[in-house]
């Protein structure tokens, strides 16, 4: 049972003037409780950064289980049922959402919507909807086991009210007490949970897919660093290195300076970074590569980019485009997947190109007159004998 208080986060709660001998009732105590709750939320809200809201990591779960546990069913009666089993997050107002199904029968968190109602909201190519959880901190949901021995008989506890809703992605507004839990997509005439979508998260450890990205990017980051060391060693140990080889080594040295600055923090703290910081880490790497190329004289840059093209099948225009995309990312807290996909494309291209160059006996000679050494690398997703940021995890 929910006891509505008709309150919102915008209400002003006054402190009650307590006097000895005054008559009091439950409403006076509830008003005092709401005053302190409201003050606490306002204090939290002032300390939260702009992107400080979203899912929180659950220390009681394994990494592969992090994120909201949610189910979507399209029934035979053409209705869409969304059921939330577990959710842990923080709203923009600083309110902690900690919901577990089955703990309290009074707090079943689900919604059933006729599929035709959702279809009527389709506009153009927009066939995705955000699944929203709204918390009402001042509505009191009775919880616990009723105690009939007390007078009057009552439920011992109350919890805030949670409700689910759907909103087309282009019309979604993240208000102070709303969390995006996931995304619904339409496939044919059926509605399914979009498992590729990553909702707003407060850290990489809050979602299994972000943890996977951390590990995968770490493998490629490690590969780029190792290849950069090998390229520099090959170039400086030859007295007849060409300008192409020397310029490649210069880029590698810039990369190595950057990885040296990132090494400790990435290895020890990277898993707990905010998603925006992870994007910043690799966007900065792209910027370093871009600037290093542009420090070269124009013809030398063109020769080097053309040389990369010979060994990577990535044209100079495409390679610069990958760097520019990674540099120019505009972080969207509600669309993490897009930013991580851009970074993944850049890292994969750079990692494969660098590994290809390492396999050459002589860096700088062109493809038609060079001996290709044995390639000693495998798929980035495989195991590596070198250090990776998650070796200790």
Residues covered by each model-derived region:
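Mixed-charge (acidic/basic) macromolecular-recognition segments
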Residues: 4, 147-286
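Short, flexible loop/turn elements at secondary-structure junctions
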Residues: 91-93, 103, 135-139
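N-terminal "first-domain core" detector
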Residues: 7-96
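Short amphipathic beta-strand/extended segments with alternating polar/hydrophobic composition
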Residues: 97-105, 196
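Short linear, low-complexity motifs centered on an aromatic residue
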Residues: 43-53, 145-158
